[in-house]
Every structure is written in structure tokens, then in C-alpha cells.
């Protein structure tokens, strides 16, 4: 979740020492529609594994549009695969898997643009990659050991999105609804929902499905125990 109104999503893992045994690293991809509960699952993994978890948010890899005005940026389609610099995320994830630190871009939702600052991120034993369209790229998928799709009813997702964008991102209700109808919903149907076929695990109802979350935690713990 956003650590501040300015910095968007902060990638967990900043400030720790370099990972020495890179064979220990497991990468978990968590995809699903907007408001599906992806971040809730990510937070539960963080709560269980603590400092063993580093998180990369696809949102931080939105392409920069410094050449456009705020009004122009607000009208862009942010739910299409082309909105993301996924190639950069692939390169960054590869570096993390090699045990190297990265400088992660930072996206600011309030200005609809990437900021000039970066986050210094170091790898950990569990790397979570989270985003609505992370399964669209084969290069990115191939770097994941476990691929999870969070499947939540559309009515629930839009209500969560309205609440989040109005409260946390300074959006108006009208702008959120208009964006949902013109880009979010059609892009979900065209790109997000079809990417579910790439998932190893489908979790209905997101963070409320404790049985499924416990199974994921058990799978990750087994991996860590084997490498201990």
C-alpha cells in the first residue's frame, strides 16, 4: 500500500544488506483485477515472513510522461500493457535474483507520473511481484516460481477502487467512475481476465480466503526450509 500520498507504492526491501545465497530466492507473482485483494495477500506474506520479503509493484513501472500536462496525463489509459515499462521491471527483477540491489522507480498517483526519485532496493529470500498485468509478459512470467491470480467479483472490486482512489489518491468520485467505465473495465476484460490462464494458483475473494493464503504460506515456507 502507499507509504505516503507522494511516493505511491514503496517496494519493501529498502536498506537491507546484499543477498549472499541467491539460490535461496523464490519469486511470487500476484496478479488480478484492480481492487481484487492483491495487496492484502502481499501484506499477509510480509506479516508472516517479515524481513525475508521484498515487494516490487508494477505500478511503479508506469512509463514517465514528463512532457505532458497534468490534464493530458490524467486522460491516459493506465490499464493497458503498453502503459508499463515492463522491460525495466524484467531487468530489475533479474538483478534482484542475481543478488544485486536496484534503483526502483517511484510513481506518484496524484500527478499521474513517475517522480524523479528512486528507491534503493536489495533482494531477499522471497520476492513478491504485484500488479494487474504482470502475467502479460512472458519474460516476466518466466522469472516467477509461483504465479497467483486473485479472482474477486467485479462489483466488489469497483467499490474497493472507488474507496481507495478517493481516500488515498485524491481522486474525485466522478473521475474514478468515468475511468472505470472507459478504460478499467474494458482493459480488465481484454487483458487482465485472460491472463488468469497463466496462474498456478487462483485465489477467490482475495485476502478473505485464509485457507488459500495458508496454503501459499506453507508452500513458501517449505521452499525456505529446504534452503535453510
Predicted regions and their residues:
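Conserved nucleotide-sensing/catalytic segment adjacent to the nucleotide-binding pocket
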Residues: 67-109
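Hydrophobic positions on the alpha1 helix immediately C-terminal to the Walker A/P-loop
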Residues: 41
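P-loop (Walker A) phosphate-binding loop of NTP-binding proteins
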Residues: 33
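Short beta-strand-centered segment that lines the nucleotide-binding/catalytic pocket of NTP-utilizing
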Residues: 51-66
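ATP-dependent NMP and nucleoside kinases share a basic, alpha-helical "lid"
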Residues: 115-169
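Conserved lysine of the Walker
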Residues: 38
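NTP-dependent small-molecule kinase module
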Residues: 4-5, 16-21, 122-123, 163-166, ...
Amino acid at each position: 500500500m502507499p507509504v505516503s500520498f507522494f511516493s505511491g507504492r514503496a517496494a519493501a526491501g529498502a536498506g537491507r544488506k546484499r543477498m549472499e545465497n541467491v539460490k535461496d530466492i523464490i519469486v511470487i507473482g500476484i496478479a488480478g483485477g484492480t481492487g481484487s485483494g492483491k495487496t492484502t495477500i502481499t501484506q499477509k506474506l510480509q506479516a508472516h515472513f517479515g524481513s525475508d520479503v521484498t515487494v516490487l509493484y508494477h505500478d511503479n513501472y508506469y512509463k514517465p510522461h514528463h512532457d505532458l500536462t497534468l490534464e493530458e496525463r490524467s486522460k491516459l489509459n493506465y490499464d493497458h500493457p503498453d502503459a508499463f515499462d515492463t522491460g525495466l521491471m524484467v531487468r530489475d527483477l533479474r538483478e534482484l535474483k542475481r543478488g544485486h540491489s536496484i534503483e526502483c522507480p517511484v510513481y506518484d498517483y496524484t500527478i499521474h507520473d513517475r517522480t524523479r526519485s528512486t528507491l534503493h532496493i536489495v533482494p531477499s529470500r522471497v520476492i513478491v511481484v504485484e500488479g494487474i498485468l504482470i502475467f502479460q509478459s512472458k519474460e516476466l512470467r518466466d522469472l516467477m516460481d509461483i504465479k497467483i491470480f486473485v479472482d474477486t467479483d467485479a462489483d466488489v472490486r469497483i467499490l474497493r477502487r472507488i474507496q481507495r482512489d478517493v481516500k488515498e489518491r485524491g481522486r474525485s468520485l466522478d473521475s474514478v467512475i468515468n475511468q472505470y467505465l472507459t478504460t478499467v473495465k474494458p482493459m480488465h476484460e481484454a487483458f487482465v481476465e485472460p491472463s488468469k490462464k497463466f496462474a498456478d494458483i487462483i485465489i477467490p475473494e482475495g485476502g478473505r480466503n485464509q485457507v488459500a493464503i495458508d496454503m501459499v504460506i506453507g508452500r513458501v515456507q517449505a521452499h525456505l526450509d529446504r534452503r535453510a
